[in-house]
A protein has these predicted regions:
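Conserved N-terminal catalytic/coupling substructures associated with nucleotide/phosphate chemistry
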Residues: 1-118
Length: 118
């Protein structure tokens, strides 16, 4: 998969410039929404203006992403992590499948919340 093609042609994705571990709600709500609707992809290393910035520790970030999803979402959605390279930059792509056990809740602020995409 070409990262430029993914961010340029699809609407079933969200992007984050970096992994936020202290405030995972900012991206876990996208994981919840994808699992509760039609599935989708969350791309780490892409800025809001679609600039390709990459991640400095993509493998370490991927491990943290997996751990955070497993500890903050209930039930745990089906997802796959992959890496994409563009020149000297590396990106982490979280592909979330359409859930079979909806609703999927984000549990991180004391009260479970379910999200959807419109």
């Amino acid at each position: 998969m070409d990262i430029k093609q993914l961010i340029g042609e699809t609407t079933d994705y969200d992007k984050k410039v970096a992994l936020e571990t202290k405030k995972p709600k900012s991206w876990c709500k996208s994981i919840s929404a994808f699992a509760n609707c039609y599935g989708g992809r969350l791309v780490f290393g892409v800025a809001n203006d679609d600039a390709l910035v990459g991640l400095s520790d993509a493998e370490g970030d991927a491990e943290k992403i997996s751990e955070i999803i497993k500890t903050h979402l209930n039930p745990i959605p089906e997802f796959e992590l992959s890496f994409e390279k563009d020149k000297d930059k590396t990106f982490v792509i979280v592909e979330v499948m359409k859930g079979q056990q909806t609703p999927y809740y984000y549990e991180g602020d004391g009260q479970p919340v379910s999200y959807t995409h419109l």
